[in-house]
């Protein structure tokens, strides 16, 4: 879009029930380029600077992973447009990606407690959502991470191999989220089960 003209941006909006890990802003834009008119929906995500949902934001890594998956695999992800780390623009690093319209489970309140998935969706719709989510998860875990140069995701401070690192990260996240209170019993039970059934391979 370096030669774009007549750029117009719609009023900004944001999701109210999901997308809290980063500041999320939705907008539409139209422009002209090489004599042609274009219009597209976009998502702007800004790195959190105060309230954070996760122990580590890994903001740069999010963009790098999504870009690689979109460019080099068949995993369905939004088209990543550009990344800007100059904090003088919006006060924090941000990236812009294409928007994929649809209905997603909400976080506030959790979709298991209220909202369209619990109150309106048919059992077949819930099954489709769960199975498509599992398919996407399996597709991500089936990629050749070495050919995609995903070595930057290594977190040796949490352990020797990836599985161990991820498990220790989850444990650290519980302690970080509320140092004065242990993890919920269901989470403790899940962590214990995972520890006892960890795969015996690197």
PLM feature segments, named:
Residues 13-189, 193, 197-201:
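ATP-binding pocket architecture of kinase catalytic cores
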């Amino acid at each position: 879009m370096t030669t774009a003209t007549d750029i117009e941006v719609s009023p900004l909006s944001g999701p109210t029930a999901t997308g809290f890990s980063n500041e999320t802003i939705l907008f539409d834009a139209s422009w002209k380029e090489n004599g042609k008119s274009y219009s597209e929906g976009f998502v702007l995500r800004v790195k959190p600077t105060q309230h954070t949902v996760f122990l580590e934001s890994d903001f740069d890594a999010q963009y790098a992973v999504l870009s690689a998956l979109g460019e080099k695999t068949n995993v369905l992800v939004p088209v990543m447009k550009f990344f800007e780390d100059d904090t003088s623009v919006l006060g924090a690093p941000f990236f812009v990606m294409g928007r994929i319209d649809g209905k997603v489970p909400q976080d506030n309140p959790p979709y298991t407690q209220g909202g369209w998935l619990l109150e309106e969706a048919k059992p077949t719709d819930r099954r489709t959502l769960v199975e498509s989510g599992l398919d996407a998860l399996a597709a991500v875990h089936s990629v050749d991470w070495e050919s995609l140069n995903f070595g930057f995701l290594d977190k040796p401070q949490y352990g020797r191999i990836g599985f161990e690192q991820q498990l220790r990260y989850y444990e650290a996240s519980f302690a970080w989220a509320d140092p004065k209170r242990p993890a919920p019993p269901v989470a403790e039970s899940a962590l214990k089960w995972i520890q006892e059934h960890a795969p015996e391979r690197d």
